[in-house]
Amino acid sequence: MTGKLHLRPIQFVDTPVGRDGEVARLAGGMAWFAAYEVSKGGKRRTVPIAEFEALAARDERAARLHAAITSARPALTLGDRTLRFDQPLVAGILNVTPDSFSDGGKLQEDPAAAAAAGVDMAVKGAALIDVGGESTRPKAPLVWEGDEIKRVVPVIERLVKSGTLVSTDTRKAAVMEAALAAGAAIVNDVSALYWDDRSTEIVVRAGCPVVLMHSPDPKKGPHGGDGYGDVLIEVFDWLEARIAAVVAAGVDPAKIIVDPGIGFGKSLQDNLALLNGLTLLHGLGCPIMLGASRKRMIGALSNEAPVDARLGGSIALAMKGIEAGVQLLRVHDVAETVQAIRVWRGLKDAALTLSFERASL
């Protein structure tokens, strides 16, 4: 059990109006909270925001975590495109693999059709398209980097030509290099730059944003390792250490996005604990990506629903992430997720408008 202090925002409210000094804004987004769950050495207690200043004055880590949690995340300028993290964004998943668990490899043989599917997701509201050429399902075979490059580069080139923002979902430096040369703007690595010794160098040289995803033992693959004492704290500490390591190697901290790795080397109970405690991860000071779309946990909680019948569960998990202040949702079902976000945004706007009107009376 770690002896470090951790802060998890809790007790969320609809509006900050009339609550000066009693609530704090979460990461510059559309959520406000009234207290922290403070954990240290396995012990937890609740500290209201109104009383937090005293704790911050005597504990440097508490002050630093509070600053990270409440600071707005800087926008990412990617060519003529800008990703702003003051409200949730959607990343559309585009797999070009023969053994994809979600689409059965339908797009692997036809780069033009794959790119068209990506453009369609962008039209439906995806801020970027995440292109992957290697399956990360459990027991999936390792793909030779040359084959992976052949799968993804023609698709990325077409997407970029259409004006679509692209991230490359890979753990291999050679694939990162080829994808970035083809116009991809972001690296999304399920190994958090661990798998390939050259990966960090590629990201540093490109100066591109990178998604660092947690898995217990990335050198063994995305599903290597298992077993946690406190999964939420351990994932936080792992990502905190990984961020420090890649920043020391030259990665710009303002260009790091973190992903808790739902479904990667984690049991159903681990995944549920992570989702219920997601707000803790804002203490890392980075935008958070959540990839829970169509995951096995949805089937486990819904009478073993097959992959193509997990839309409801995917939306439920996306909304859980949104309520926790997640900035980027990685999903298969873009139109439905975007609609859910718009309805959520309408509810938020209505609560704020009503509170301002009441305050002016």
What would you call each of these model-derived segments?
Residues 1-79:
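N-terminal accessory interaction module
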Residues 1-30, 85, 100-117, 136-165, ...:
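Active-site-adjacent loop and "lid" segments of alpha/beta metabolic enzymes
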Residues 57-69, 104-120:
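Histidine-rich, glycine-flanked metal-binding segment
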Residues 73-91:
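Glycine-rich, aromatic-flanked loop segments that form ligand/cofactor-binding clefts
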Residues 97:
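Flexible glycine-/small-residue-enriched beta->alpha junction loops
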Residues 116-132, 324:
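Catalytic domains of carbohydrate-active enzymes, especially glycoside hydrolases
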